[in-house]
């Protein structure tokens, strides 16, 4: 009986452990809600993105993301959920300031 308890505990710990290793670098947008990189024409009230599109290239870092969006006159933002070119919740991309 103790063996099954120990085996179940070991299996639970193994399953609960993270599968991928995160180094902390190279992330443009934070994980979670604001995980969609967008190039937006304008940002209203600091939270609403208008005229948003996916970047034309895959950015390497925040500065590259800012440069990609700047080519079309847009701002580099991380948004919650793009709907028809409008994003209700956006924040500045990491390293794009």
From Swiss-Prot:
Keywords: Cell wall, Disulfide bond, Secreted, Signal
Induction line: Expression is highly up-regulated in the presence of root and stem powder of Shanxin poplar, but also during carbon or nitrogen starvation.
Coiled coil: none
Disulfide bridge partners, by residue number: 29-78, 39-69, 40-52, 79-90
Signal sequence bounds: 1-16
Pfam families xrefs: Hydrophobin_2
GO cellular component: a single term: extracellular region
UniProt function note: Aerial growth, conidiation, and dispersal of filamentous fungi in the environment rely upon a capability of their secreting small amphipathic proteins called hydrophobins (HPBs) with low sequence identity. Class I can self-assemble into an outermost layer of rodlet bundles on aerial cell surfaces, conferring cellular hydrophobicity that supports fungal growth, development and dispersal; whereas Class II form highly ordered films at water-air interfaces through intermolecular interactions but contribute nothing to the rodlet structure.
Stored PANTHER family: HYDROPHOBIN (PTHR42341:SF1)
Assembly and binders: Homodimer. Homodimers further self-assemble to form highly ordered films at water-air interfaces through intermolecular interactions.
Family as reported in the entry's similarity comment: Belongs to the cerato-ulmin hydrophobin family.
Protein name, entry field: Class II hydrophobin 4
Source organism (scientific name): Trichoderma asperellum (strain ATCC 204424 / CBS 433.97 / NBRC 101777)
UniProt lineage: Eukaryota, Fungi, Dikarya, Ascomycota, Pezizomycotina
Name of the gene: HFB2-4
